[in-house]
Amino acid sequence: LHLDVAAFDFAGLYPSMILARNISWETRSPTPTEFACNLSIPRDFSETKSEHMVYFKTDELGVLPKAVMELKTLRDEYKRRRKEAKNKAEYTKWDNNQMAVKRLMASFYGVIAKQGFGWADVTLAASITASAREAIRAAAFKIQEME
């Protein structure tokens, strides 16, 4: 046990980034939008280079974020049913279902990042990981401010 230590966890970090930035094949934008991903690793948030920026449209939800949203809704339903289970077998059934959906959502990144796979897109994969790094760094800076 350690004093003054807290655990911090992002629920489904990569799927959350897909949804938060509307990251999808058809939503990539050639012009700047509010959904921007900085593919470089800046030391602080003021360091950005435009050649390392990827933008995603904000006017319509992309195919990938829609899929994440629908799966999150389905997973929440399975978790609700698990909570209401009357016996161990029912609990196990709904727990297995929600875990399957969780793994499916997590696999989206792998499918996009796997070169040679039909849906692979290095820029999308990099946008997801860059967004995740940014979220982790923002959380770390926020936590440091609280000290």
Residue positions per predicted region:
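Conserved acidic
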Residues: L1-E147
